[in-house]
Amino acid sequence: GIKQNSAISNMTKAGDKSFNALLIGTDAAGENTDALMIVHVDKQDKKIRMLSIPRDTRVTVDGKKFKINACYHLGGLELLIEKIRELTDIDINYYASIEPGTLGEIVDCLGGVEYDVEQDMHYSDPAQDLYINLKKGKQILDGDKAEQYCRYRSYVMGDITRTQSQQKFFKALFEQKLNIKYATKINDIYDIMCEKVKTNVSMKDIIFNMSVLEIISSGEQIECYDAPGNYNDMEKDGVSYYLIEDEHVIELKTLCAQFFGGSYV
């Protein structure tokens, strides 16, 4: 069955009207998070909203500064969700931690995603077993190419453009594949999840939330948001962080209260 995590048993149960799911992409070692995206499904307003938290976001753990992508390694899901809650004031109902290769398997299972790649992408990192070679333009991304696209990092604007690109890809994936005609694939996808994904989503949850498939009749139903903040210059430790502080925290919490069921007043 699916690898459950008992430490997260105190997570809030999803309501009938909406829920928040945290998508976590881990690196090849499975230690740090490579991507963090909150997906809010509003069944009442028939909307799906996505919010990405940049992996370089600075957080404090036991009085020390870290990038949020280290939380998974430092204190597991519990610490990661705690830090996301500190930044956003939202409850996470579901989580799915995805290792490299898993997204590709799901994309292949669904027959690829039609996508317009914005630029030529070339990158290689043998340590991560990551080799990217994509051409600009409209194409069908199979699983391998979808993985390459979502893991590409050499943007001029760095992580911000990367999170926007990941959102854009997931928007295309949801629009094209969250469709009743792909409902027959649910068992296959669930099998992949059982093998490769750490999650608290059960088959019962999937069936309970099947109405989500009806939401995605048009692209206007999917909205993407960025976490407000800015990059600082290199600190004394030689690390550059993305800062969500002071007015940006208030801005983010206000955004989350408005669109992600957050509790900030």
Model-identified regions with their sequence ranges:
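Non-catalytic, solvent-exposed segments at the cell envelope interface
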Residues: 1-265
